[in-house]
């Protein structure tokens, strides 16, 4: 259900303007909401893993769930970190500084240098070591792209065990096979798939009504297919199409906008392969995956795009 835009932030981006305020506002996530009822009713809160393709609401669900659990102390007791973000030079300098035990210290460790997993030491440990603020018994740490940790996962498992009384982890990943078994066995697993077509189309129709956008009856379903059920991408596509067609969207105007958004990247990818520029092709493919497109979507797009390229010229 779309929130009343008057009660929202006045963002120019519809995907932010119509972002859900609570779990109840999330469409098409009935299984997830049913599975978390016990936590919200005061039950034992487990560590969790949210798995699924990019763009299906995993991070939004994690933040909304954390906010409902923590209440007024949400800002103080919840933190989100990104495993895909590189460690900064300042963080590395701090790790080096703290990994050395001064010779002025008493004991066998004096003068020794330790090696710490950079991500865990700089972004996880400082948060989990501090006790919850206020009346809450636990804090919540959300880690996006958890599969990127790779070798640091064993160290993370030990932190999970050590601070399990005061901190819960929500791990977000689109590569569940890259998460080690000891962590999987300690977490409640939730899978996020694309929302059903009926719920998606109803949302698009409600937004169009609130934004005074005129659409053909087939447009919501066309948007659903174009973005493979990703709500945020669907709302962005709707806004872009509305801006380019004076708020009157038909199949042709929608096709032009959607085709432009991915067609250029696919075009460059194919041309790079044919010209043996594999580094450029790999970068484009990774950028499309990072943008949330699945392998099957990219392959379908490549099959369509290849027919429009002057291959006889490119092969010369």
Regions from the PLM with identified roles:
Residues 1-4, 269-316:
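Helix-rich C-terminal "collar"/helical-bundle subdomain used as an assembly and partner-interaction module
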Residues 51, 55, 209, 218-232, ...:
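A short helix-loop-helix "switch/interaction" segment in the helical subdomain of ASCE P-loop NTPases
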Residues 121, 197-205, 217-224, 282:
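An amphipathic alpha-helix signature
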Residues 238, 242-267, 299-300, 315-316:
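Conserved C-terminal helix/linker of AAA+ ATPases
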Residues 1-189:
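P-loop/Walker A NTP-binding region and its immediately flanking N-terminal helices
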Residues 220-226, 232-246, 268-271, 282-287, ...:
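C-terminal helical "lid" of AAA+/P-loop NTPase domains
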Residues 18, 141, 215-218, 249, ...:
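Alpha-helix N-cap/N′ positions at the starts of helices
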Residues 188-200:
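Conserved AAA+ ATPase "SRH/arginine-finger" region at the nucleotide-binding site
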């Amino acid at each position: 259900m779309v929130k009343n835009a008057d009660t929202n932030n006045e963002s120019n981006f519809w995907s932010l303007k119509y972002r859900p305020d609570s779990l109840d506002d999330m469409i098409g996530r009935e299984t997830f909401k049913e599975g978390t009822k016990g936590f919200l009713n005061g039950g034992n809160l487990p560590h969790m893993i949210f798995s699924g393709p990019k763009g299906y609401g995993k991070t939004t669900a994690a933040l909304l769930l954390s906010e409902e659990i923590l209440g007024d102390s949400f800002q103080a007791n919840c933190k989100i970190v990104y495993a895909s973000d590189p460690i900064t030079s300042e963080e590395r300098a701090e790790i080096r500084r703290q990994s050395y035990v001064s010779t002025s210290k008493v004991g066998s460790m004096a003068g020794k240098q330790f090696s710490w997993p950079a991500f865990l030491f700089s972004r996880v440990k400082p948060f989990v070591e501090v006790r919850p603020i206020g009346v809450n018994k636990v804090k919540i740490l959300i880690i996006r792209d958890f599969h990127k940790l790779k070798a640091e996962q064993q160290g993370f498992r030990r932190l999970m065990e050590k601070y399990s009384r005061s901190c819960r982890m929500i791990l977000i990943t689109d590569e569940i096979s890259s998460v080690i078994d000891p962590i999987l066995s300690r977490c409640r697993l939730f899978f996020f798939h694309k929302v059903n077509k009926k719920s998606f189309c109803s949302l698009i129709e409600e937004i169009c009504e609130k934004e005074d956008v005129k659409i053909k009856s087939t447009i919501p379903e066309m948007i659903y297919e174009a973005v493979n059920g990703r709500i945020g991408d669907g709302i962005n596509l709707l806004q872009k199409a509305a801006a380019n067609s004076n708020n009157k969207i038909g199949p042709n105007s929608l096709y032009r906008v959607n085709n432009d958004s991915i067609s250029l990247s696919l075009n460059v990818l194919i041309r790079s392969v044919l010209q043996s520029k594999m580094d450029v092709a790999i970068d484009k493919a990774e950028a499309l995956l990072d943008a949330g497109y699945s392998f099957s979507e990219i392959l379908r797009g490549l099959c369509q795009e290849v027919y429009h390229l002057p291959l006889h010229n490119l092969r010369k």
